[in-house]
Amino acid sequence: MKFTRTLVLVSTSLLATVATSQAQEVKRDTKKQGEVVLKPITIISHGKDNIEATGGTVLTYKDIEKLQPANVSELFSRQSSIAVSGGGGPSKRIHVLGMEQSNLAVSVDGVPQTATSWHHTGSNVIDPAFLKRVEVEAGAAAADSGFGAAAGAIRYETVNALDLLEPGKTFGARIIGSYGTNGRGFSGSTAAYGLKDGFDWLLMLHGTSGHNYKNGDGTEILGTEPAARNILGKAGYEFDGNRIDIGYERSRDKADRLIKMNMGLPGDTEYPLEVARDSVNIKYTRTDATDMWDPEVQFYYNRNDYWRNDYQNRTNGNMILKEDLYGGKLQNTFTIDYGKITAGIDFGKHDYNTDNYGHNDRRYRKFNTQQVGAFTQGRFEFDNGFSLSTGARYDYSRFADWNDEVFSDSGASVNGTLSYKFNEHIEVFAGASRTWLGYVLGDYGYVHARNNAFYTDPTFSPGRARNYKAGVNFGGADWSAGITLFDTRIAGLPNYDSQKLGNDPEEYRSRGFTLNARYIWNYTTIGATFTKAKVTAGDDPVLPNSGSFMPIGDMATLFIDQEIPDYNMKVGATLAWAGRISDEAATAANFYDQPAYTVVNAYAEWNPPAVKNMTLRVGVENLFNENYYERTSFAPSQNRGGIDAVWAPGRTFTFQTAFKF
């Protein structure tokens, strides 16, 4: 019966795509790719999904330049639907609607990223200094978003030479230096880029050096010193209508950190930790694409390393984790009368290696997963006011564990979002998806503390997810607003108990609504967001233990940006609020109630008329020195002799100077 329902969903989705594709071929839109005409309430624009129109988040290069984020907490500071836990860079965990980003299909420049390796580490995958765009597709994700998009997708895109070069120039450089109080210390970013005879290139370096910060009460928070050393390199070549892009990203963070970076234990001590990531990718596209031939071919390799020295003669976080992820994607996009259809295949292999320094009778473990999938996604705008984004994918998944036991299965995923625009000011939409996740390994770092008898349950099965959303968008020439109701359910996740790897019997669920509004008047932009979410495991609220699912309750943001062209100045501020959380399940598990907090950030930026290529900026985070821990952090409790949160920084000033040549 389950297979029949899936088959019906797949058939319906494919029939919608095929039927629409029978339309006559028309001339390709001559607008620049990615350009969006100001229609703030339509879910499809130029054959692409409008992520914001269905409750998602989009940060453009202009948005990121305004924020100048030093970390991912500041990157998402204006989004109430996205919460980032505190601490040092490697400890930050990103949750979307209360679900950790490992439950979403995460990519950087189209390259799939590994999930969070251990429940005491962070989920940060990219240096904000390299970013030009971020898309967070919450809920029902498109089939071409990638494999395993249980709760949506996060797409990070980094800058290249063509983004930074001034019009008419073939070479450029950018230097940014800053100093911050409260342990932030020094940060420097240098970039050089050029263009010659169809060849463009970019090299960017970014590093930070500081000390542990203090919270709003003046207490030093151990293990929080900035220590990033990152490199981004890109090259592209265009010839005879072809384009080849090659990218390399390298990130290193080496410093003394807490044993478990997301929680404060009694008598906590710092120990050396190194987190490393390397990513290489090559992509082929056409610059003279036609309606029927618009290909994209990409191959990639990712490596992630986690190294904690052998500081104790027992399993307590001292371990080595190594991951290798490699694969590719081949797809083509067809342009027809009413939109676009993308179809293709993707594949990947993920190798895992663990070493617990021999503090058990099984020191080393090696295991892997493999995936191959085929997908199609259509995005259509019709003349009668309807828009439709619908697609399907079919995947094969294989898991070979540390005992050479092999598990394999296959399954289908479908999605669809339909909207109707009553006029230029009102649009309603509804969407749903059913996603097959393959074998989900999740926080595989648990195996470092398991003995040789640890095995995989023979009944271990693939995960699955369901998403539903509906909403209304309103808008005009200078304003927009919307409400989105969402309901996400994920089941079949892994459970690493003391004896075996099996399936968690609970279904995890996040449901609620989001609100957003924005108004632009001359040189002023004002925006606000509000999110209310109930996150449960089975019938019970999830515990605030920094897991893959976290309670977020009520959260809101308010921001304003003001340009003052007569003085070459820009100023702005952001207010973030989180409501109090108190529930019986958390109290019974010895957690304290989570207090409400309000945090204000502000900035001022000036371009001196005498030095037009220089920008001076001063920013302040936590202006009123609030003592708080960010929502989705491990909450204080009475367990283990008293667990404390990793508190967020107190008031921090940052002074920045930037030159562009």
From Swiss-Prot:
Protein induction: Induced in absence of iron. Maximally expressed during stationary phase when cultivated in low-iron minimal medium.
Localization in the cell: Cell outer membrane
Alphabetically ordered keywords of this record: Cell outer membrane, Membrane, Receptor, Signal, TonB box, Transmembrane, Transmembrane beta strand, Transport
Domain TBDR plug: 48-159
Keyword check for Nucleus: no
Molecular function GO terms recorded: siderophore uptake transmembrane transporter activity
GO CC, any one term: cell outer membrane
Signal peptide positions on this chain: 1-23
Residue ranges annotated for the TBDR beta-barrel domain, each copy included: 170-661
Phenotype reported upon loss of the gene: The mutant is unable to use hemin as an iron source but retains the ability to use ferric chloride and the siderophore 2,3-DHBA. Exhibits an accelerated loss of viability after 144 hours of culture in low-iron minimal medium. Exhibits significant attenuation in murine macrophages and is unable to maintain a chronic spleen infection in mice.
Role this protein plays: Heme transporter playing an important role in stationary-phase iron acquisition and required for maintenance of chronic infection in mice.
Family under the similarity heading: Belongs to the TonB-dependent receptor family.
Record-given protein name: Heme transporter BhuA
UniProt source species: Brucella abortus (strain 2308)
Gene name in the database record: bhuA
